Amino acid sequence: CTRGCRFCAVGTVRTPPELDPEEPKELADAIKRMGLSYAVITVVNRDDLYDGGASHYKDCIQRVSETNPGVGLELLCSDLDGNLDSLEMLLEGLPLKVFAHNVECVPRLDSVVRDPRASFEQSLKILRYAKEIRPDIMTKTSLMVGLGETDEEISEAMEMVREAGVDMITLGQYLQPSIRHLPIDRFPEPESFADWDGTARELGFRAVA
C-alpha cells in the first residue's frame, strides 16, 4: 500500500513492485480450489498508478468471474485517489454483487486516523458515484469505533453515509495492531452497538452488522 493510515497493519511502500500479470489467474484459481460460493476481493491503495490500480482490479474480478461463474463477488475498493473516471471504468460491466469502500472513521478524526490523501468526504464521493453509475450493485461501507469519536458523531456519520445512497454498513471495534499504531480510546458496551444497529435500520440501511 502506498498510504500510511495510523490504524492499519498493512505495510506502507513508497515504490511498490510492478503489477503481477499472473495475479488475475492465480486469484481465480485459488477461489476455485477453495470451493467458495462468495468471495470478497480486497485491494490496497496504489497512488503510484495512473488509474489507482482500477484496470488491474477489473482484470482480477473478471477473471475470477469467468473461472467461477457461480461465485458471488464483492470488491472492497480503495478510493482510487478520488478519480471518478477510474471508478467508472472499473465498474462498467463488472460482475459484482457488492461494491464496498470504507469511510473508516468519523470526519473529525480523518487527520488523526487516516493518511492525508484520504478523507471522509472523498470516500463518500466514491460511494455516491458508484451507486449513481451502477444502481444495480449494493454499496457498503464500514466505520470503526474506539478511536476517540462520540456516540453523536457515529450517528451523524451514519446519516451522511446513508444520504450518499449506501445500502449496507458495518460498525466494528478498533483494535490496535501494535504499539506504533493509534491507541484504543474506548470499548463501547454491547448495548451501544445495539443502539447503533437500531439507528442504522431506522435510517434505511438494508443490512447492518
Show where each model-derived region lies.
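Canonical Radical SAM [4Fe-4S] cluster-binding loop centered on the CxxxCxxC motif
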Residues: 1-23
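Short, flexible active-site-proximal loops enriched in glycine and acidic residues
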Residues: 3, 31-40
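Active-site beta-loop-alpha junctions enriched in small/polar residues
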Residues: 11, 44-46, 76-81, 104-106, ...
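Auxiliary Fe-S-binding modules of radical SAM enzymes
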Residues: 25-35, 59-71, 85, 89-95, ...
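Conserved glycine-rich "GG(E/T)P / GGGxP" loop and the immediately following alpha-helix
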Residues: 39-59, 148-153
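A short acidic, helix-capping loop that chelates divalent metal ions and anchors anionic groups
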Residues: 45-50, 107-113, 177-183
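Active-site-adjacent beta->alpha loops and helix N-cap segments on the catalytic face
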Residues: 48-59, 83, 109, 116-124
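Small/polar (Gly/Ser/Thr/Ala-rich) solvent-exposed segments
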Residues: 101
